[in-house]
Design a protein with these regions (language model features):
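Short, Lys/Arg-enriched, disordered terminal segments
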Residues: 1-2, 26
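Conserved nucleotide-sugar phosphate-binding/catalytic loop shared by glycosyltransferases and other
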Residues: 3-8, 30-81, 87
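Short amphipathic alpha-helix
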Residues: 13-25
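Helix C-cap/helix->beta junction micro-motif
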Residues: 28-29, 91
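Proline-aspartate-enriched helix->loop->beta-strand connector
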Residues: 88, 92-95
Length: 95
């Protein structure tokens, strides 16, 4: 079974994702698990340390005011959406 888990930012999302991955590996030892997260969150440390592959995306929130930073973040989000589709297409997950 091939599984993608998306978890980023804080341990509140990453640790449950790792727990789910561990349970899947226990039940289905031949399963392949891929994590997708950001390049600046806790996942860059926690996921590889748990023994799982991590692919990263650049995702940023938007500010309330109109700014050049918001424009750049929108472009990064569009690019990250394309990259996420690429990761999914290449990995071909069952779940």
């Amino acid at each position: 079974m091939r599984v993608i888990i998306s978890a980023a930012g804080t341990g509140g999302h990453i640790n449950p994702g790792i727990a789910i991955a561990n349970k899947i590996k226990k039940e289905e030892p031949n399963s392949e698990i891929l994590f997708i997260g950001t390049s600046r969150g806790l996942e860059t440390d926690l996921v590889p340390r748990a023994g799982y592959e991590l692919k990263t995306l650049e995702a940023y929130g938007l500010k309330k005011e109109i700014s050049f930073t918001n424009f750049k973040n929108i472009l990064k989000t569009i690019n990250s959406s394309r990259l996420a589709k690429k990761y999914i297409k290449e990995f071909k997950p069952d779940v």
